[in-house]
Amino acid sequence: MTGHVSKTSHVPKGRPSSLAKKAAKRAMAKVNSNPKRASGHLERVVQSVNDATKRLSQPDSTVSVATKSSKRKSRDTVGPWKLGKTLGKGSSGRVRLAKNMETGQLAAIKIVPKKKAFVHCSNNGTVPNSYSSSMVTSNVSSPSIASREHSNHSQTNPYGIEREIVIMKLISHTNVMALFEVWENKSELYLVLEYVDGGELFDYLVSKGKLPEREAIHYFKQIVEGVSYCHSFNICHRDLKPENLLLDKKNRRIKIADFGMAALELPNKLLKTSCGSPHYASPEIVMGRPYHGGPSDVWSCGIVLFALLTGHLPFNDDNIKKLLLKVQSGKYQMPSNLSSEARDLISKILVIDPEKRITTQEILKHPLIKKYDDLPVNKVLRKMRKDNMARGKSNSDLHLLNNVSPSIVTLHSKGEIDESILRSLQILWHGVSRELITAKLLQKPMSEEKLFYSLLLQYKQRHSISLSSSSENKKSATESSVNEPRIEYASKTANNTGLRSENNDVKTLHSLEIHSEDTSTVNQNNAITGVNTEINAPVLAQKSQFSINTLSQPESDKAEAEAVTLPPAIPIFNASSSRIFRNSYTSISSRSRRSLRLSNSRLSLSASTSRETVHDNEMPLPQLPKSPSRYSLSRRAIHASPSTKSIHKSLSRKNIAATVAARRTLQNSASKRSLYSLQSISKRSLNLNDLLVFDDPLPSKKPASENVNKSEPHSLESDSDFEILCDQILFGNALDRILEEEEDNEKERDTQRQRQNDTKSSADTFTISGVSTNKENEGPEYPTKIEKNQFNMSYKPSENMSGLSSFPIFEKENTLSSSYLEEQKPKRAALSDITNSFNKMNKQEGMRIEKKIQREQLQKKNDRPSPLKPIQHQELRVNSLPNDQGKPSLSLDPRRNISQPVNSKVESLLQGLKFKKEPASHWTHERGSLFMSEHVEDEKPVKASDVSIESSYVPLTTVATSSRDPSVLAESSTIQKPMLSLPSSFLNTSMTFKNLSQILADDGDDKHLSVPQNQSRSVAMSHPLRKQSAKISLTPRSNLNANLSVKRNQGSPGSYLSNDLDGISDMTFAMEIPTNTFTAQAIQLMNNDTDNNKINTSPKASSFTKEKVIKSAAYISKEKEPDNSDTNYIPDYTIPNTYDEKAINIFEDAPSDEGSLNTSSSESDSRASVHRKAVSIDTMATTNVLTPATNVRVSLYWNNNSSGIPRETTEEILSKLRLSPENPSNTHMQKRFSSTRGSRDSNALGISQSLQSMFKDLEEDQDGHTSQADILESSMSYSKRRPSEESVNPKQRVTMLFDEEEEESKKVGGGKIKEEHTKLDNKISEESSQLVLPVVEKKENANNTENNYSKIPKPSTIKVTKDTAMESNTQTHTKKPILKSVQNVEVEEAPSSDKKNWFVKLFQNFSSHNNATKASKNHVTNISFDDAHMLTLNEFNKNSIDYQLKNLDHKFGRKVVEYDCKFVKGNFKFKIKITSTPNASTVITVKKRSKHSNTSSNKAFEKFNDDVERVIRNAGRS
């Protein structure tokens, strides 16, 4: 974070990212065919990078600015909770110990900052207020605000937290961490969670080593029971690992924590998001396939069991690629010291095929578990488990409706539906539209929606505020249940009165308070006879933000005691007494009104009834209507909701104390980074995974999804997973798209289902209960007639809503709620208890990128291992060739994300040829209102176009790279789309991927696995929990490409992966790069689809080797390229097997010793990695975060299925690292030779084996040497000569910015290039003595280096190179005399000035400064600002110019961008300023600012200006 691309002086201090950075992204993204999507993507990426980097480097800065600025008093209390010490800090928040001032109960409060800027957004009335109130949790208040807010504020992604809240409300189990309540104020969310002082199981395991089997099974059994309980709700945790398991040492009880990645698995719908920690993720997740959550959780449990019993992990490697491949293969070493039962259970859990994997029920019946059932502790637990089983809570088949039967609510109209609960259901149902869920709730048949609605309603009722003595609770509940008609009337009255009182007393607006307010109001109006008239306690609105109304309620203890017996599905932790705080701008305006009316007696379930029915749940659901208790519950008891009983329950201090005493968990790890702060919070904060669009399944997944489409009810399953929803909600109109898809598909099926169109409730009832997705093998084929019918039914309402507001119910309340928000402005933000409130889903317009990668055709070829024959060490250049159809792989560098320029002339200039216009935009952009089905008929066409786009998507394929390349440019070594396209240096040894599919390959797609056999060994830092031991010979899975099967000297078949997988080291390596581990290499990446891989997909030897190598390194002409199209590597290209002795088998045996000291496969030191906590990766920007291999668990989200891993980082990101010194200490790049290994080419410049390849080589830059990135880029530009960049110190230089264009221009624009080459050669020959750049070379390879010397004259290189110098004849400059002169010139120019003392320099600067002031030239052109900007950047790239973005400003129609530039040779600097003028012309000002000047630099400057003039003139002609 030390340096930004733009100077800090240009950026306000408090900004999370510099203005220049954001502006650059916006400006460059404009050129993209879909600027809105591109800029959004870039901003998400950069924001996630910023957040993650801050988390790593400045953990203290994660506290929100708003919190810091708020008064100390505001942070001392939250409702009844007195805040204590900070237990831990995370990227997006912190966890503090808290004590209930009323009950003395301890809790851990997770404080998640909300960003400002969404308080007053809804006042314009453009969206219903209830909708805009979702600002509280979605950080986006309206479509117009979304982009602005996102660009200005780091995304804490409260939406993910909101999902976590909803899930935790549904789950109450002794082995699951409890959520007591949720509070909020203007700037923060407060999740009041169980406090456990025992710490994480991870810490315990680290301190104790492997556990005795008896103890391990004791804990494991609890884990399985908790997981099984979650599965009974169709909820899958998806991130089970010791770090997320809290241990109450006193009670020896496990608590499952961190539901940030949990998801509801919908019937007939597979989960698609690859998430979790790589070490614990199941193979199906690692392969990026759709999967059932249940079996995946079981796999994770198996890994945890293995770790408990052995002290290390079965699959472990510092190199993420290797780790994932190990998991994918499912091969591990079973320790011989385990008992036979343990080995048997582990072998049944760790099965690759999820359908054959044991289930949680079977685990609990396994002999290993039964073996220790007689333990005294286990007897108690067994009794508890028995109770849970009686409630159907421990079944693992996820047939929710068969297992849980709480009292089911009967709803008769939309008006009865509680908006906050509806919002929660939307979250759980992955963004399904409100109309569809509403339709399901109103249907007679039983449905999962109704069940969850009932459960959430019960939770809400129990956590509502009681405003009267609870002694009357039960009594009043009974009375009210008898008077259903009166209660309905009363609820109406209450609603009206509540609305009136709401206007009169804004302070008490909150969904929780409104229940009580309504109740009291109803009583005051005497409109009800049936409702207990004893609720007369006044509603106290307190003005202080966090003060508490401590209304004593001595009589509530009885009711509370009864409440404790309620089913676990409803946490009984009460909220504080009368939390009547002013509703900060946030929430509830209209929603609370709605809940006011809805949550009134009508919708609440009486506690007693629900308790009965839940305990009864052995009774099948279809009998539900016949059960008197249930029947009364659903009809009358539900209406009796005003019953203060439920309200009082939440108040009972006794109840709180009792429950909490039993469950203290979480946050014991104050000493070791609290589990919360780093896991739950940071995951949520960076939930970019959720922000990314999830596309249709890959071809391999297609069959499953087709089945899904056939059978799945659209209302329940939108085509996108929940994470898509997050992305779309926050950044676009994906919600609209989702609904369109649902409705379109529904419409297509309507005709097919016409005969079934008569919705039969009995059938429906069975359907949903039977359709549970959890059945591991049960795919989408579980559909039921009912669901279809329901969906027809639910679908129709939305069909006719094209003209309606998305939330018509609240439209009329807009004015009221906006005024309410305005009233709130001047006052201090109050803390609101939002335990039961949720904000409306943000329905922003956005883009949905559709990608279906079809690459299976190449598998055949790729399966053929390439012959092994030692060849000279070759360096291959990374080349990305643009493909007409290729969807651009989104990169962090804005310039990477630019599709073809609008101006065809500009395009030709950039790419050296005019290629055909792409048939369609790279992006699929569909707009539509979420609730308008006008475009329903377009579904089919849209899908078709999506297919074409998908096929046009150009997956980044890794082609063979020389085995020496330790780093293989982390970014450029993108393996074809899903497979391992993530640089391992970012993936800490135990991180949690939010989306592993990004880096995982499809099973059928082996080609992407064809990681160059040559890829050099990576220098992986450390193997957590592992140490290298005997290798196991494993046959690679079918999806492992045969290309990888290059055998090393070990001869172990499993080791074939190590060459490639070593290519990227652990993140720690980024921090301490050994100089002897660098190898210069390159690979040629084809950014092409499998069908389009014909363009130069084969790796070429770089020109640094002997002449014959140079010859082969020459880029193949376009005509020849198709020959190599079938595979991603040249068939005749043989890969050197150097360093076989050092290669390791990626499937190395696990250490059997307790120490678990893992030996890194790299040369870096080993460390006992047990202490490194798993990092949950939830960010798509993982590739840009240097996660230290420390105990910090960083949560990064990687969930952008639609975009390839960025191959370059932006200038801004590079500059953050402050990698290069201002002036190179030595212009010659000779240090690198010492860092190359073995018998490498003299010219093999060391490329960092770590993540540095992605940015720049830290060592290179810090030592004043050119970064390998620049070397790589220049070598791409000049295939036959070593780029002059090697000797230059690039300033935050971005690598390979426009390799495609350069390559194309080399190939296609041959004539023009030749002609310019000739001129350039002449020019260079004239100036050779002064301008030829120094080249990295060894004496023995002088000839080769000479060839590499087709360098461009120092400055002249700059622009000349753009078109001409790109591939100037190497022979022209291959003479040794030139080399000599180059060195001399070096001494003359830059070094000369450097060696003078300060006094001489001072005067020299004075004299040269005068020259510099005069050396300025303006170029006026009629091309657009963006085109001029792009041309300039391209010129920089092609002319070996290092540049630094100084300023970029787009204000009031005026666009200005400034760059500080420097030629790769010498100290010759200049400025370029591009300004748009009101008359639509653009002025490019080139100003020389070098402190010293000479003839050659002046000449070069003139030449550069001529080049600029020529380029813009050519562009302007069009």
From Swiss-Prot:
The gene is HSL1. Belongs to the protein kinase superfamily. CAMK Ser/Thr protein kinase family. NIM1 subfamily. Keywords: ATP-binding, Kinase, Nucleotide-binding, Phosphoprotein, Serine/threonine-protein kinase, Transferase. The modification Phosphoserine is found at S511, S629, S685, S837, S866, S1220, S1250, S1284, S1287, S1325. Its main location: other. GO terms for biological process: G2/M transition of mitotic cell cycle; mitotic morphogenesis checkpoint signaling; negative regulation of diacylglycerol biosynthetic process; protein catabolic process; protein localization to septin ring; regulation of cell cycle. Pfam families: Pkinase. It is an enzyme of class 2 (transferase). ATP binds at L87, G88, K89, G90, S91, S92, G93, R94, V95, K110. It is found in: Bud neck. Residues 1-43, 55-83, 467-502, 599-651, 741-783, 856-898, 1005-1030, 1150-1170, 1220-1243, 1259-1291 are annotated as: Disordered. One of its GO terms (cellular component) is cellular bud neck septin ring. This is Probable serine/threonine-protein kinase HSL1. The keyword ATP-binding applies. GO terms for molecular function: ATP binding; protein kinase activity; protein serine kinase activity; protein serine/threonine kinase activity. The active site is at D239. Residues 746-758, 856-876 have a biased composition (Basic and acidic residues). It comes from Saccharomyces cerevisiae (strain ATCC 204508 / S288c) (Baker's yeast). It catalyses: L-seryl-[protein] + ATP = O-phospho-L-seryl-[protein] + ADP + H(+); L-threonyl-[protein] + ATP = O-phospho-L-threonyl-[protein] + ADP + H(+). Its EC number is 2.7.11.1. SMART domains: S_TKc. InterPro entries: Kinase-like_dom_sf, Prot_kinase_dom, Protein_kinase_ATP_BS, Ser/Thr_kinase_AS.
